[in-house]
Structures are given as C-alpha cells and as structure tokens.
C-alpha cells in the first residue's frame, strides 16, 4: 500500500510539473519605475521570454530576475544566425557583449564589468577584417 501511495504521489507531481507555463511574449512586458512587469502581474517579472520567427527559428531569449535583465540574453536574425549576446547581472551588463552581421561574421566583442567597458574592445568589418 505504501508503494502504491508513493507511486501516485510521484505520478501526480510529474503531471503537475510537466504542465508548461503559458509563454510570455516580449510585447506583453512593460516598464514601470525602471523594472519590467508582465501585463498580468503586480510584482516585477521573473522568468524567461523566448520567441521564434514565423518560420520557427529562434528570435530571442531573455531572462529577467526581479524585473531586471539577468544572465545571457540572445537575439537571432530571421536566417538563424546569431545577432547579439549580452550577459547581465542584476540589470547591468557584466561579462561579454557580442554582436554579429547577418552573414554570420562577428561584428564586435566587448567585455563589461558592473556596466562599465572593461578590457579589450574588438570590432570587425562585415568581410571579417578588423
């Protein structure tokens, strides 16, 4: 009987946790007093915003914590090539910031520490020359 009860608890918890949360679109977010909120929430937004181009290719992936950008943000061109990656911590650029041309060639790479440019700043032309 104890094994059966454990099985049902496991089954129920699996069903509950496997239900996907409704995706939040970037356009459903708004700014208030410097923080980001979802249109249906009273508290600042915590979570991920993932969107695709109509073709199904990734368009963007943003993470928010306490209404501020957090972790790595990524954008892609509609051809699937990466467009931009930015690392945030508590709403401030902290780490690498990279951008690409639509042809896939890297455009620039910069490093930030606490929102301030720190270190080497490298830029490339669309043909790959620096």
Q: Language model features by range: what are they?
A:
Residues 4-14:
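Sec-dependent N-terminal signal peptides
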